[in-house]
């Protein structure tokens, strides 16, 4: 157990508490002197703020007992989480699949609250449901005299009930949403719980949002203020004044939100709510209501090529059985839907179309339902029947036809250009036109969001769009472009009645339609089958490629390669489970189907990326922190961010924040200034769940942040586990969530040693430097100072000159520089003046294989990117961090060159597709272990990313992000490619009695990795070579100044600094004014030299800031991380030295 103390973190009194107590779920010793089991804490505590949490647990237990008594089963974890929210007074939307018991929960909660004399209001969409629900709730032990149901009533009864409603003479009121709309004036304003069972129906009348808010205690003025803030937030091109106004109004609304008297719980929407009024819930109640989409798929994706669509369709429908959706490609037109229906029915297959009543299909009386494979089609968009739908067959590849005429819709032209872009890029002659195409795409994308009415009302805008259409049309009909399309493997050009039309795959249509076969239910995700009847090979190839932009896990297989019998058996097994759950045959305690889990990561970017992998998340705000909620398999995930470290060593207690006693070293941590809201919000959020997964970065810093968060949350959550992932991809996250682990205490100890060493040495040295120079901002870190010394020494060498006679050869893009060095300037000048030619003797000529460089580690990436692009090392680390968080590269703080099987798969796919299978040459490079090289996570090159940005699928990437990504991508792909076979020559160069040997690479015999990562060739020199016009006499430095990149390279070579600290060291030297950067080179300042000389002259200080001390300490920290060294012994040795040094009062 690691010993540590956290200031102000006792969950009961807010005082000091040990990490040991926190991790055991206990308050501090002052609050509870004896150590008891977590379960006994509430019984033993007499007073304090933790009693509120105890009361929550007690209320939850009472509700669970009540639930079990009325229903005969225990509630599921998700229902318990909803109950916690109600008891905590938090309004929320229920994101949950079919069969999880949303209605049951609402009724049980209303019934439970009624026993306490608290009022509930249940709002339903139809009169029929009002009657069904009222009958059901009577079986929940509700006193019927305290229940008001607004159903089919006589006028007398209506009058009587309205009077009772007005007086508040009831515990539970059940009505339709229309009743609320017409009668809200008579409704009391003291409801404890309002349950909206069908939010889609509720929202048909947008004013219902206002009315339910009145019931919760808000005024008309409050709602007006909230709506004004919504309008302000949605205003385009906001000014600084607008942002100030948003801040001011948000603070005012936070106060208004405290008026809320009850809890509103609504079921999540199944359609996209159209009214902006729905956003009032976000501003006043802290939660969003949107259409949740689940992007998880459990679908076997197959295809077959066919010349006869109808016959093949009939064969497959008969083979697959009932529960099928048939999607006709939109290029066949709506009439084809009827044709297909008639054809199937003429061969004994009962079918219905999307325009007919689907009840026959749901009952199993119709074998298939037929629609169009477009995301706009109701069958592709709206059907959610997990117990019925088993498979989807695509009658032709889903396609979009783009007529090449002026009237073509803006969105279709956009698709056409996006599909054409990669083809233009591969053509050397057309490459120069990509910029123009990109500009068109950006403009078309902007216009695609505008409605026809909006455009019609603005003649200038209409003209601009018409002119753009004409430009694009002329381009698409150009002879060379038409030829390019005709020869393409992915696009089809057809000559129809109205001229040429371009045919591209409808990717969103495919994903939306096939997704109907795999739906969330209370047991997870149903298995489905999607089968494409390929009528156009090019369109299918286009579909295969584009579908990977959305989901890397989709792989089409030929139908012959699939065990169809087994797939259909698994599909039927799932449908049976769904039916049993819907019919109530499966009891909840048989299996915990959907489990709520809190996931904490470091950054909001990472939280968003992860949440978006699994669907469109719903947002909430708790205690000032943002939470995203989404379904991941059988987990209901609430994901939030800690924004990095939350705690740091205190500054003014004990020995620089550490209790040092008898060989024991106990750090004291405090909340970092500005992070108080995060601590409060995380603890409030923790009270809603039983499990938290900590997904901080996979290194020592991430492990320590995670361990701190574990200590913070443990009093409220019994299960705190660590999840580790080295790339932010759907597959990696899912694997991590399914395989949590304990915290690795060795990693935590290593970070603890690093932080304490930095604090002890840094504080002591900085104090002395600040006093000596009377500048309070100066510092002297244990890594900073030796690195400053190198820069100073390098500058001294830079000022010393040597003389070089340089000969430069340029030949067909090839370069070679030969240099003859001299210490004496006169001798150099004499050599230069007499040099007319050189003699090149070929000593050996051979063929050899040149291997590619390994993939990047942190130091090699920083060196190459910094030197190539002149981007600072801290900025590069920020760019890499963001690329990692967006899910585009693996973790960027690494010393490893190892390539995983997943990485090799990424390379294989891209190299085989783009360059040819013969160039793929897999290599693992480094040793085994958790860490991997820096590589792309998907087989997408930089132009794919640009296309995705233009299509709106990737946001927030800058030119610099793309430069770094391209470098990482090419270096990695090169590392997985064939060596290059080259011709080399070993030559001896003689000139005026001087000679030197060189190895020249003169010819590429067989292509390999050079296809992506250029290989330098030198001119083929031999015999006597005239150099009179190629020579130059120069004075050059003995050594060149460091660049940021070469400084990182030096740190790595000398064993100082680590992947997580390189950038910090460089930025500290610049921030403190010890070093400046000029033309990309690092130059020590006068202050930097003075500080270094001052420290160097103090023999008692220098050992602590020497290269040797720092390197040894880094090695010891590595050993602590590996469990080979006791961290307390390392701290003990360090303490003795620092303490001695302090006492000496240097």
From Swiss-Prot:
Reaction(s) the record says it catalyses: ATP + H2O = ADP + phosphate + H(+)
Enzyme Commission designation: 5.6.2.-
Domain Helicase C-terminal residue range list: 412-565
Origin superkingdom: Bacteria
ZnF RG N-terminal-type span: 1-38
Listed InterPro entries: AAA+_ATPase, DEAD/DEAH_box_helicase_dom, Helicase_ATP-bd, P-loop_NTPase, Reverse_gyrase, Topo_IA_2, Topo_IA_cen, Topo_IA_cen_sub1
Subcellular location: Cytoplasm
Binding site for ATP: 79, 96-103
SMART domains, per database record: AAA, DEXDc, TOP1Ac, TOP1Bc, TOPRIM
Transmembrane domains' residue ranges: none
Cofactor note: Binds 1 zinc ion per subunit.
SUPFAM superfamilies with a match to the protein in the record: P-loop containing nucleoside triphosphate hydrolases, Prokaryotic type I DNA topoisomerase
Residues annotated as domain Toprim: 596-728
Entry GO terms, CC: cytoplasm
Keywords: ATP-binding, Cytoplasm, DNA-binding, Isomerase, Magnesium, Metal-binding, Nucleotide-binding, Topoisomerase, Zinc, Zinc-finger
Entry binding sites for Mg(2+): 602, 697
Chain spans, region Topoisomerase I: 592-1146
Biological role: Modifies the topological state of DNA by introducing positive supercoils in an ATP-dependent process, increasing the linking number in steps of +1. Binds to single-stranded DNA, transiently cleaves and then rejoins the ends, introducing a positive supercoil in the process. The scissile phosphodiester is attacked by the catalytic tyrosine of the enzyme, resulting in the formation of a DNA-(5'-phosphotyrosyl)-enzyme intermediate. Probably involved in rewinding DNA strands in regions of the chromosome that have opened up to allow replication, transcription, DNA repair and/or for DNA protection.
Subunit structure: Monomer.
HAMAP family: Reverse_gyrase
Further remark: This enzyme is the only unique feature of hyperthermophilic bacteria/archaea known and seems to be essential for adaptation to life at high temperatures. It may play a role in stabilization of DNA at high temperatures.
Protein family per UniProt: In the N-terminal section; belongs to the DEAD box helicase family. DDVD subfamily. In the C-terminal section; belongs to the type IA topoisomerase family.
NCBIfam families listed in its UniProt record: rgy (TIGR01054)
Name by which UniProt lists this protein: Reverse gyrase 1
UniProt source species: Aquifex aeolicus (strain VF5)
């Amino acid at each position: 157990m690691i010993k540590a103390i956290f200031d102000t973190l006792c969950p009961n009194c807010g005082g000091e508490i040990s990490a040991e107590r926190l991790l055991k779920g206990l308050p501090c010793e002052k609050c509870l002197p004896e150590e008891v089991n977590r379960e006994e804490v509430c019984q033993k505590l007499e007073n304090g703020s933790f009693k509120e949490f105890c009361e929550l647990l007690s209320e939850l237990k009472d509700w669970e007992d009540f639930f079990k008594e009325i229903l005969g089963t225990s509630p599921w974890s998700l229902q318990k989480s909803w109950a916690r929210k109600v008891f905590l007074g938090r309004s929320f939307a229920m994101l949950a699949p079919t069969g999880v018991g949303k209605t049951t929960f609402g009724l049980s909660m209303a019934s439970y609250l009624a026993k306490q004399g608290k009022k509930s209001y249940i709002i339903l969409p139809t009169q029929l449901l009002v009657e069904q629900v009222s009958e059901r709730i009577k079986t929940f032990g509700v006193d019927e005299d305290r229940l008001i149901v607004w159903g089919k009533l006589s006028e007398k009864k209506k009058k009587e009930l309205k009077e009772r409603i007005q007086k508040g003479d009831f515990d539970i009121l059940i009505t339709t949403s229309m009743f609320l709309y017409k009668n809200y004036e008579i409704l009391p304003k003291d409801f404890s719980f309002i349950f909206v069972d069908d939010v889609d129906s509720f929202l048909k009348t947008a004013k219902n949002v206002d009315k339910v808010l009145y019931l919760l205690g808000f005024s008309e003025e409050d709602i007006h203020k909230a709506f004004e803030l919504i309008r302000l937030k949605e205003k385009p091109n906001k000014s600084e004044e607008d942002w100030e106004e948003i801040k001011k109004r948000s603070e005012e609304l936070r106060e208004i939100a405290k008026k809320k008297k009850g809890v509103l719980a609504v079921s999540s929407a199944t359609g996209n709510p159209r009214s902006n009024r729905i956003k009032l819930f976000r501003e006043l109640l802290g939660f969003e209501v949107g259409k949740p989409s689940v992007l998880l798929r459990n679908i076997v994706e197959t295809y077959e090529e066919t010349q006869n669509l109808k016959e093949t369709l009939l064969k497959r429908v008969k083979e697959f059985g009932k529960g099928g959706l048939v999607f006709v490609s939109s290029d066949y037109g709506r009439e084809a839907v009827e044709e297909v229906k008639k054809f199937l029915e003429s061969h004994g297959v009962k079918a219905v179309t999307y325009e007919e009543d689907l009840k026959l299909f749901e009952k199993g009386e119709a074998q298939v339902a037929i629609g169009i494979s477009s995301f706009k089609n109701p069958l592709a968009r709206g059907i959610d029947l997990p117990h019925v739908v088993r498979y989807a067959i695509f009658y032709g590849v889903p396609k979009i036809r783009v007529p090449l005429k002026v009237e073509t819709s803006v969105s279709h032209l956009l698709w056409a250009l996006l599909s054409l872009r990669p083809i233009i890029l591969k053509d050397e002659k057309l490459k120069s036109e990509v910029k123009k195409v990109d500009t068109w795409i950006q403009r078309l994308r902007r216009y695609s969001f505008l409605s026809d009415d909006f455009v019609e009302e603005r003649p200038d805008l209409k003209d601009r769009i018409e002119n753009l259409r004409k430009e694009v049309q002329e381009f698409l009909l150009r002879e060379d472009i038409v030829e390019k399309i005709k020869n393409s493997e992915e696009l089809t050009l057809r000559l129809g009645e109205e001229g040429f039309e371009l045919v591209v795959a409808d990717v969103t249509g495919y994903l939306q339609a096939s997704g109907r076969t795999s739906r969330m239910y209370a047991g997870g995700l149903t298995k489905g089958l999607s089968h494409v009847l390929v009528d156009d090979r090019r369109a299918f190839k286009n579909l295969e490629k584009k579908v990977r932009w959305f989901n890397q896990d989709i792989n089409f297989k030929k139908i012959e390669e699939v065990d169809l019998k087994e797939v259909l058996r698994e599909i039927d097994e799932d449908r049976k489970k769904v039916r049993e759950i819907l019919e109530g045959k499966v009891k909840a305690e048989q299996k915990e189907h959907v489990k709520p889990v809190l996931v904490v990561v470091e950054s909001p970017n990472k939280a968003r990326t992860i949440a978006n992998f699994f669907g469109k998340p719903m947002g909430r705000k708790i205690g000032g922190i943002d939470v995203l909620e989404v379904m991941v398999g059988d987990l209901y995930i609430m994901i939030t961010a800690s924004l990095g470290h939350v705690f740091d060593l205190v500054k003014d207690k004990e020995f620089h924040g550490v209790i040092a006693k008898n060989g024991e070293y106990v750090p004291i941590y405090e909340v970092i200034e500005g992070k108080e809201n995060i601590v409060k919000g995380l603890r409030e959020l923790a009270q809603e769940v039983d499990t938290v997964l900590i997904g901080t970065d996979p290194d020592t810093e991430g492990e320590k942040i995670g361990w701190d968060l574990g200590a913070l949350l443990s009093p409220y959550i019994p299960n705190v586990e660590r999840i580790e992932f080295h790339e932010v991809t759907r597959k990696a996250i899912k694997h991590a969530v399914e395989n949590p682990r304990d915290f690795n205490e060795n990693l935590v100890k290593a970070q603890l040693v690093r932080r304490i060493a930095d604090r002890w040495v840094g504080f002591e040295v900085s104090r002395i430097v600040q006093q000596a120079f009377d500048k309070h901002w100066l510092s002297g870190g244990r890594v900073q100072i030796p690195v400053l010394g190198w820069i100073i020494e390098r500058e001294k060498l830079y000022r010393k000159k040597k003389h070089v006679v340089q000969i430069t050869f340029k030949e067909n893009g090839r370069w070679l520089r030969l240099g003859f060095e001299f210490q004496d300037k006169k001798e150099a000048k004499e050599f230069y003046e007499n040099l007319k030619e050189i003699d090149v003797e070929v000593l050996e000529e051979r063929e050899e294989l040149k291997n590619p460089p390994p993939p990047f580690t942190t130091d090699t990436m920083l060196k190459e990117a910094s030197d190539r692009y002149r981007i600072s090392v801290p900025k590069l680390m920020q760019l890499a961090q963001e690329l990692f968080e967006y899910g585009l590269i693996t973790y960027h703080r690494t010393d490893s060159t190892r390539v995983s099987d997943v990485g090799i798969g990424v390379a294989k796919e891209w190299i085989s597709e783009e360059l040819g299978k013969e160039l793929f040459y897999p290599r693992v490079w480094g040793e085994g272990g958790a860490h991997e090289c820096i590589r792309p996570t998907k087989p997408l090159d930089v132009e794919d990313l640009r296309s995705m940005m233009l299509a709106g699928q990737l946001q927030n990437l800058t030119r610099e992000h793309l430069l770094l990504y391209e470098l990482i991508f090419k270096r990695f792909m090169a590392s997985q490619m064939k060596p290059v076979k080259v011709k080399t020559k070993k030559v001896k160069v003689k000139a005026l009695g001087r000679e030197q040997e060189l190895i020249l690479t003169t010819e590429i015999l067989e292509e390999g990795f050079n296809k992506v990562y250029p290989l330098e060739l030198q001119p083929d020199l031999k015999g006597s070579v005239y150099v009179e016009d190629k020579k130059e006499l120069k004075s050059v430095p003995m050594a060149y100044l460091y660049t940021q990149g070469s400084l990182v390279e030096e740190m790595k070579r000398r064993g100082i600094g680590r992947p997580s600290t390189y950038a910090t060291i460089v930025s500290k030297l610049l921030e403190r004014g010890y070093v400046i950067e000029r033309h990309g080179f690092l130059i020590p300042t006068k202050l930097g030299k003075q500080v270094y000389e001052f420290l160097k002259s103090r023999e008692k200080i220098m050992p602590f800031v020497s290269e040797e001390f720092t390197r040894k300490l880094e090695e010891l920290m590595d050993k602590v991380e590996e469990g080979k060294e006791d961290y307390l012994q390392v701290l003990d040795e360090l303490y003795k030295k620092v303490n001695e040094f302090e006492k000496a009062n240097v």
